[in-house]
């Protein structure tokens, strides 16, 4: 499985957009993109309808792969697990139902959020659940996802935020928001201000 992971240095900040079209991003303390991957999903037939659902084992493997690669770089003693806890911070977007959002969509989003929380807890990672309005205001974004894509392109011009389709680029707001969540965590760490999260 290609995790798209590059060697990391020192601290690691991970941002997770928990939607089924979301993503996981990891950057180091210099803002270098270490990994940027879509949330692993599978296509399942429910009755006559094909649906995308979360691929939980692959989600866990993705996060573990990022940590293993980063841990090897962090730890010269050969025991990366000893040092991961003090070198990693995960920013998980805290989800809730939104106006005009369908029941099925809200349920799916909540499932993804719960799966990621379980994986993070199992790995014992330091993390914060961050309200969308909090991190977006801090980065001067609006509710329009296009502003997140534009901001991510400015901050991370080399990141793979989209793909070419019929002669034009289609950008992933899930990848953009995951990157910006990681960037928000980095900014808060640099300012020595705890992430503003909901308990």
Per-region residue spans from a language model:
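Phosphate- and other anionic-substrate recognition elements at nucleic-acid/protein interfaces
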Residues: 1-199
